């Protein structure tokens, strides 16, 4: 019983430390200008992503969910 209580205390302390310093998790958030294209396409399944963030795309391309997959696409200038 003491081991369970000690484990819960340790987990609580670790979670509090993580919440007290959120800047560590999102240190270098990088987003390219423009908006992701929005097309309503029904996806029966999601394909393996070709990118994870804008930083992984060449030139002015953005990493967006497009045709059931995260991929590098030309961004829109406005959201409309």
From Swiss-Prot:
Annotated Pfam families: WAP
GO annotation, biological process: defense response to bacterium
Presence of the UniProt keyword Signal in the record: yes
Domain WAP: 29-76
UniProt KW keywords: Antibiotic, Antimicrobial, Disulfide bond, Secreted, Signal
Superkingdom field: Eukaryota
Induction: By intranasal administration of S.pneumoniae.
PANTHER family found in the cross-reference section: WAP FOUR-DISULFIDE CORE DOMAIN PROTEIN 8
Name of the protein in question: WAP four-disulfide core domain protein 15B
Organism whose genome encodes this protein: Mus musculus
Encoding gene, per UniProt annotation: Wfdc15b
